[in-house]
């Protein structure tokens, strides 16, 4: 499939092939990563990348949009069907762009927002001082209970009463437990706040009924379209009639220009795939695998924040091992096991070191792995973290990982990337 690229730019072609090899021979345990289908990749690699289409279907600023109109309309309809909403905007280039559009539509600079602390599992776009959200708005934070590691809803409610925020965000990037959207809406209503649910990590679980839905609770919902949803990298906004017009205008012309029609086509394909019964089976297996992996890690003597997981990810507290998250990530990389360093609640380490690692099961579940493989993966992780500097041991494990991966190849579409 790369014959034209090899002829034009062999350096890039070689790097792509090497990345494909890395994905085939290693275990991808980064909670935000997954493998798309060949159908999604074909849509993204199509002639749609050539087409400008500013505006919405039927209301474009360019001619020649009859076919991209049909594609975007399908993406909108499938997204609404998948999540049970009346309106969707499929144009955001990313989850961050979706959040920017929501904030600029619903807030004025200086308005007060209440978001989850980044080191407690929140996200940069929910008020971090290094992000636009922390620079433009008056931000206050809630977090998790120190004993349980779960969201402290009583403290959240107390803070909301004290500061009377314009917007409360319920969204996470490293939180392993179920989010109580109904309780969040109750708190928001009590103080007259709007509720935004950022379900970027759990969208696939929500769509499949494996996590409670924010629909009917949140005033607006944002998400990415990859991660557990297994689509192309991009963003999505879901909403009802009350905010549809202003949110659509906030995406275009408010914060973006021309939409990426090839990515929107990929989103439409992915939404269609997620509407099939087998996607529900896939999402259920993600959670079963996560529970099995969490149990295996705890059996290795490792500590998990909150003591386990209800969704697709878990957060390992490494302080008892003497390793930082960065050190653990490097050692696991050498063993062909990919994770990411991640802050734990009230982490004493700086962001580039951290005291934890985040682990997720969406990608290995796509490969067809199940609970027995999770037990083996947990054993490998435990061994690596016990002997992080034993190069011979790490090389042996990398070989064993490659052997396992041969029995559970990445989707056939990925293999075809080799040509």
Swiss-Prot record:
It is found in: Cytoplasm. It catalyses: (6R)-5,10-methylene-5,6,7,8-tetrahydrofolate + glycine + H2O = (6S)-5,6,7,8-tetrahydrofolate + L-serine. One of its GO terms (cellular component) is cytosol. The record marks 226 as: Plays an important role in substrate specificity. It holds the Pfam family SHMT. SUPFAM superfamilies: PLP-dependent transferases. The keyword Cytoplasm applies. Pathway: One-carbon metabolism; tetrahydrofolate interconversion; Amino-acid biosynthesis; glycine biosynthesis; glycine from L-serine: step 1/1. GO terms for molecular function: glycine hydroxymethyltransferase activity; pyridoxal phosphate binding. GO terms for biological process: glycine biosynthetic process from serine; tetrahydrofolate interconversion; tetrahydrofolate metabolic process. (6S)-5,6,7,8-tetrahydrofolate binds at residues 118, 122-124. Gene3D superfamilies: Aspartate Aminotransferase, domain 1, Type I PLP-dependent aspartate aminotransferase-like (Major domain). Its cofactor is pyridoxal 5'-phosphate. Keywords: Amino-acid biosynthesis, Cytoplasm, One-carbon metabolism, Pyridoxal phosphate, Transferase. Catalyzes the reversible interconversion of serine and glycine with tetrahydrofolate (THF) serving as the one-carbon carrier. This reaction serves as the major source of one-carbon groups required for the biosynthesis of purines, thymidylate, methionine, and other important biomolecules. Also exhibits THF-independent aldolase activity toward beta-hydroxyamino acids, producing glycine and aldehydes, via a retro-aldol mechanism. Homodimer. This is Serine hydroxymethyltransferase. It comes from Chloroflexus aurantiacus (strain ATCC 29366 / DSM 635 / J-10-fl).
